[in-house]
Amino acid sequence: MQPITAQGRPQATRGRWIWVLSGTLTIAAIGAFGSWAIVRASNSPGGPTPFSAVPTRTVIVTRPVTALNVQSYGAPIKVTTAPGPVRIAESVTYDSADGGPPTVTDTDSRGLLTLAAPACTNANCSVGFSVTVPSGVTVTASASGGPVTVVGTGAADIDSGGGPVYAAGIGGPLTVTADGGGVTVNNAAGADLDSGGGPVTATGISGKLTVHAEGGGVTVSRVPTAAIDSGGGPVYAAAISGPLTVNAEGGGVTATGAGATQINSGGGPVSASTIQGPLSVAAEGGGVEASGVTGALNVDTGGGPLSATSLTSPSAVVRGEGGGVSLGFLTAPASVRVDTGGGDASLSVPGGPYAVTADTGGSQESVLIATSPGAASSISVTTEGGNLQIGPA
């Protein structure tokens, strides 16, 4: 069966059909298990001009499509959803000195539709695609420089060679690899995001979120669990209902409203608040601020100061290399161990008595709470020269 066109006529060339179009092309199904291939040429009357865009060409695919593979070189890719057949709009730009417009191919085999312009990998041209597919279609998109937008599809795998990526309403797992452009994701079933330098923003992820960013900032919110690796940019995480892990090479880290949280900072400051579970922080030099931690507190400041307030932690272990430590508890902890490495230490705890041991290295020591050597709750503080104060909350 020949393909059908409403506005245009087929011309045979080298055993394949080239469609000279002025409007819309409708491709009919060839057979239940067959495949089709379409090659288009310019529809500009009088021929193209150097570096000019061929008027947008639209194709309607009547055959069922379950998966889409789009490849673009230097031009945008946009995939959205709507009921009905697949619609493809192509925007072609090229240099007429190179011999004519690039070949654009569409091939389909067993429900997989592939859109590509292979000639543009080495030629001075670009082809952009704007595709409308039914919801649930899985998408693979690869762009060498142009922006990529995918909205409302099934699972998606996006590879961007530098342009920004935007994905929203993805009904299956989402994978994004971006070599420099920013990445923005709103609502996906799960996401694995890798950015070569651009910023990353992800919100409303219903499954696990994994982010690797070489240098751009990372902002995530409303996800059940997140693992973030930042090569230097700041990290902001909020409304994480489950575990949160952050490794930051130098940028600051802010976490608010999370489950069990582990933060490793290569130098930037750390702020953690409303942590519903244990909090573990290793900071190479930046200061640490924490509040509203309900689980065990474990902090190694590496030199920067630590201030932790509104704690209901059952235990706390703090190690510092010179920075001061301030801990404020709302409920009586079972065990507290602090070593400031030289900085001052200030603790406020409710109730008592506590079994208190302290070594200030000769500096001032003030203990204003009830103490007993055999008490069930214990506080041990070593300041190595810093002053110590323990008082009631």
Positions of predicted regions on the chain:
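Hydrophobic membrane-insertion alpha-helices, especially the h-region
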Residues: 16-36
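Amphipathic repeat-derived elements
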Residues: 2-7, 53-57, 67, 72-77, ...
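Terminal targeting segments of Actinobacterial cell-envelope proteins
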Residues: 1-17
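Short linear S-[DN]-x-LW-Φ motif typified by the pepsin-like aspartic protease active-site region
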Residues: 35-114, 122-140, 147-159, 164-169, ...
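Short, surface-exposed interaction patches in beta-rich subdomains
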Residues: 183-195, 200-393
